[in-house]
Amino acid sequence: MRSEEEIKTAYAQINSLYKDAVNGDEKAVQALHQTLEQVRSNHANIPLLNAYHGSIMILIARDKTNPLEKLRWSKAGLKLLDDAVIFSPQNFMIRLLRGKAAHKLPEKHFNRGHTAIDDYTFLIKSHERGKGFLNSKAYWQLIYELGEVYYRMGRNQDAGICWRKLKNETQDPAFQRLLLSKLKLVEGKPAVETRTEPEGPFASLLRRIVNEAQNQIPDNSQQTT
């Protein structure tokens, strides 16, 4: 297959399967991983393909049950996403892929809340300047999730600003109720606080593995399942 056709086929498969992969279809995740691993072996310097592969690795980590495997795949995916942003920092889709991945990762184990904030803020401000590709629903979703990240990091004032902005813009009754419930979480709270969450057995095990293995994990950006 010629290079142009191989790349075009990869993007077509991404368009076909990526949403299913995000929604929990493990077969779609594995199909995209195999395709992207193959095309990247021939075209290693396409930032958007690297970012998609990094995002898929985060989904592979999601589906793993072994904590160390979760950590390995998450680390590999984040490396590809970070490198893609370094090479193409103004690419809206790359920033969206990395921001969404960072938003989903547990803050206490990965400390990537700042990454989600950087990427989401870039996308939101770009949209407000008339740039980018977000529709109104996606724009509101990013502001809502940005508020969630701020809240998880103990930045109550910033979280409240995000949720109040949405409350003033939306007319949807269900969304209004959700935002009111979120605003109650930060009502009367200090602007910034240290937030701790109860740690269950699985989280405790993952924390120990992270602490013990973080500096010993090789770069698995070419790893297969």
Predicted segments with their positions:
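Helix-turn-helix repeat elements of alpha-solenoid scaffolds
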Residues: 21-36, 70-79, 112-125
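Alpha-helical adaptor scaffolds
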Residues: 58-61, 82, 93, 98-140
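Flexible helix-coil transition and linker loops at the boundaries of alpha-helical arrays
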Residues: 3, 37-50, 82-91, 124-136, ...
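Short coil/turn linking the two alpha-helices of tandem helical-hairpin repeats
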Residues: 19-22, 54, 59-68, 104-110, ...
